[in-house]
Amino acid sequence: MNRVPVTTSSRTYDVLIGHEILRDAGKHIRVVLPKAKRAFVITSAPVRKHWAGIVTDALTAEGFEVIFLEMEDGERAKNMASVEDLALKMMAKGADRQSIICALGGGVVGDVAGFVASVFMRGIPVIQMPTTFLAQVDSSIGGKTGVNLKAGKNLVGTFYQPWLVLADPGVFSTLPEREFRSGLYESLKCGVIRRPDLFDRMERDRQRIVERDPGLIEWLITESVRVKADVVGADEHESGERRILNFGHTIGHALEAETAYKYFLHGEAVAWGMIAVTMIAAGLQRTDSATAQRIISLCLAYAPLPKIEVNAKKTANRVKGDKKTVHGVTHFILPREIGKVEVAIDVTDRAVVQAIEELKYLSFVG
């Protein structure tokens, strides 16, 4: 088992990473919440089918009363209606301020459950139990919670750190191939923004990674978590350095919104977003052609990314509604070299439209 501490101004907690760690979930939770009695496990139907038994046994062994609450999975369920539905179900089941929430699922479940925990009775503890690669290396860590609006992604939310994160790579045995590969892009992002060695490893050992080599996957998760923990620890509320974690996300979120969250998996949209801002960086001569080619090639190598058929101008307009837009100026994270990025405010609307047009072409010709 690997332990990565996350130290923020509001809370310090551990991310525990290891195969079979869910079987000891109750013991680990009991260490940080010795008096808790009732655990509301928010999950989706497919995840509950595979992992409810193990989680129930682990929690009841430590004296927890376990209550499962199901929500739909996918970005379309990431809305205020889901929040109200879960909160009302918790009230009906007798939840109080001594209750805890366990978020058992992917990024959407974690974001929604975390948001519910942050606002239910003005805040109750939340334990993150991520079941996708993407959630284990990114969304379960750092305290970002929230839901989408029709106008854009994650526009209503809170910063609310979990009490503990339990990342069990063993759950990937039931994870569909497309979802697994989609999640790998968050690790690739970590390599570009901070860790050249991680990027190099993903280039060198791509075949072993896509074949889910257990030791390599655990290493990849652990090192990606270290990047996230370091950045979040330095900037909990995204006022400065934490913005680098949005590499690829600004245009990626616009692609998701333009397709009504029905077409791309999150990691796939981020991959296209990373390619787009890399093209922009090369056009602005912020990075050299060799670096740009390495990033673009690795993004294309890890998965067959969905074709892009959106209207470039409409998608570019959605970028302006991104939460990273301040006083009408959108902040883009551009790569300079592998392991180093910059926050740019001089990217024109025309450059964004052109990048999306280039993505469309690239998505069809490969």
UniProtKB/Swiss-Prot annotation:
Bound cofactor: record note: Binds 1 divalent metal cation per subunit. Can use either Co(2+) or Zn(2+).
CC cofactor: Co(2+); Zn(2+); NAD(+)
UniProt superkingdom: Bacteria
InterPro entries: Dehydroquinate_synthase, DHQ_synth_AroB, DHQ_synth_fam, DHQS/DOIS_N, DHQS_C
Alphabetic keyword roster: Amino-acid biosynthesis, Aromatic amino acid biosynthesis, Cobalt, Cytoplasm, Lyase, Metal-binding, NAD, Nucleotide-binding, Zinc
Location relative to the cell: Cytoplasm
Residues the record lists as binding NAD(+): 73-78, 107-111, 131-132, 144, 153
Chain sites annotated for binding Zn(2+): E186, H249, H266
Catalytic activity, reaction form: 7-phospho-2-dehydro-3-deoxy-D-arabino-heptonate = 3-dehydroquinate + phosphate
HAMAP family the UniProt entry points to: DHQ_synthase
Pathway(s) served: Metabolic intermediate biosynthesis; chorismate biosynthesis; chorismate from D-erythrose 4-phosphate and phosphoenolpyruvate: step 2/7
Lineage, opening ranks: Bacteria, Pseudomonadati, Acidobacteriota, Terriglobia, Terriglobales
Name of protein: 3-dehydroquinate synthase
GO molecular function, a single term: 3-dehydroquinate synthase activity
A Pfam family reported for this protein in Swiss-Prot or TrEMBL: DHQ_synthase
SUPFAM superfamilies: Dehydroquinate synthase-like
Primary role: Catalyzes the conversion of 3-deoxy-D-arabino-heptulosonate 7-phosphate (DAHP) to dehydroquinate (DHQ).
Similarity comment: Belongs to the sugar phosphate cyclases superfamily. Dehydroquinate synthase family.
Entries under NCBIfam families matching the protein: aroB
Species in which this protein is naturally found: Koribacter versatilis (strain Ellin345)
